[in-house]
Amino acid sequence: MALPIIIDCDPGHDDAIALVLALASPELEVKAITSSAGNQTPEKTLRNVLRMLTLLKRPDIPVAGGAVKPLMRELIIADNVHGESGLDGPALPEPSFAPQSGTAVELMAKTLRESAQPVTIVSTGPQTNVALLLNSHPELHTKIARIVIMGGAMGLGNWTPAAEFNIYVDPEAAEIVFQSGIPVVMAGLDVTHKAQIHAADIERFRDIGNPISTIVAELLDFFFEYHKDEKWGFVGAPLHDPCTIAWLLKPEIFTTVERWVGVETKGKYTQGMTVVDYYFLTGNKPNATVMVDVDRQGFVDLLAERLQYYA
C-alpha cells in the first residue's frame, strides 16, 4: 500500500525536483500539495506548484495556498537563489487549473480527517503552514504519522552563520513543529550539502531524453550557477529538498541519529539556529531523527531511475 503524504513546499528549484521525484514514485500517494512563502512570494510559489503539476499532468491533486507571511515576522525570500519567478531557467507551462478556494491549513486538515491511515507531512519550505495546522487542529495530531522537513543544520548555516534559510524565515513555526510531540525527521544542511549534483549528473539526467528529465536538467543548470561561488566550496549544487522524498523511498542511503532539537528564536547572532543536542547534554529526550550523511551516488542513481518514469 502506498504511503499517503501531504507536501508543503515553496518552489524553488529543489522543491520542484522533490515534486518530480515524489510523483514518479508509486510507493507514495500524494494526497495534497500546499504552498508556503519562502523561496519566493506566496503568489509565485503557489503558481509554481500549479505550473509543475500542469507539466507533470497531475491536475487531480488538490492544491491550496498557505500563509502569506511567517507567524511573527516579515517575509524574507531567496530570489537571489531561485530567480524572479522562483523557477527561473526552463520554459514551464502556465497553470492549466486553479487551486482550491480554501487555505493550506484547511486542505491539510480535510486530508488528514478523510485519510484511513495516518499521513506523513513533507515540508520543504518554512514551517508556517504546518505550525498553523498543529496549533489550530490538536485533534488531528494523531492522524499525522510524522513530519519530514528540509531545514536546519547541526553545523553551519547558509543564510546566516548559524541558521539555515527555511528555519530562519520562521523560527517560531519551526519550534512549534519540533516540540509538537509528533515524530520529526530533519534533513538539514549536514546531509543536503553532501547530496550534491555534479555537472556530469546534470548531463546524465538530460541524456535520459524525456520532457521531464530535460526540464529537471534545465532547472539544475540555473541552480548550479548560484552554487559556483567559491565561498561554498562545492563541487556541484546541493539538492536540499529531494532528500526528504528520497529518505521516504530509500532510507538505507541515509545515516541518521536520534536527537533532541530546539530552535533559537531570539538570539542576537543565532536567531533561527537549530540546536541539536548531539552529546545528550540537556537531558531532553530525542524529538527528531536527524539525517547526518547520504550515499551521494545512491541519491543520484535514485533520481535518474525515477526520471525514467516519465518516458
From Swiss-Prot:
UniProt keyword annotations, A-Z: Glycosidase, Hydrolase
EC number, UniProt record: 3.2.-.-
Keyword Hydrolase: yes
A cellular component annotation (GO) from this entry: cytosol
Matches recorded under PROSITE patterns: IUNH (PS01247)
Signal peptide: none
First-tier enzyme category under EC: hydrolase
Active-site annotation: 240
Molecular function terms from GO: purine nucleosidase activity; uridine nucleosidase activity
Domain of life where this protein originates: Bacteria
Any one of the GO BP annotations: nucleobase-containing small molecule interconversion
Similarity annotation: Belongs to the IUNH family. RihA subfamily.
Function: Hydrolyzes cytidine or uridine to ribose and cytosine or uracil, respectively.
Protein name: Pyrimidine-specific ribonucleoside hydrolase RihA
Organism lineage: Bacteria, Pseudomonadati, Pseudomonadota, Gammaproteobacteria, Enterobacterales
